[in-house]
Amino acid sequence: MRVLVCGGRDFDDAGLMISVLDRLHTEKCFTVLIHGNARGADGIADAWASCRSIPREPYEVPQGEWDEIGKKAGPLRNQRMLDEGRPDLVVAFPGGGGTKDVVRRAVKAGVSVHEVNRADDW
C-alpha cells in the first residue's frame, strides 16, 4: 500500500508517529511512503520508513518555485504528491494549513484519510 504521511513542520512527537505508523504498517503493509520533504512530521516519517527499509518518495518544493510563486508552491506540491504519488492512504498528523490542504485534496480525490489526534490512544 502506498501511503502519504503529512503533518506540521513543528510536529515533533516521534513516539506518537512511530506508534501510529507501526500499527498501520502491520495492518496495511506499506510499500512506499510519500511525504513533502519538510522538517517536522515529514522528516520523522522519512526516518521511520528508512529504518524499516520502506522506499520513500519525497516531494520537495524547489527553491526557485518558492521564490517565483511564494506560498502557492506548497499547495501545488501537495497536489503533485497526490497526482504523481498515487497514495492509497493519507495519514495526517497534527499540523496547520498545509496539512489541512493535503487532507482536503485527498478527500476530494477519493483517497482514504486517517487523521491522527494527539489524544488518540495509541
Go through each PLM region and give its residues.
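Residues that mark the start of a beta-strand
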Residues: 1-2
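Acidic/glycine-enriched connector segments
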Residues: 11-122
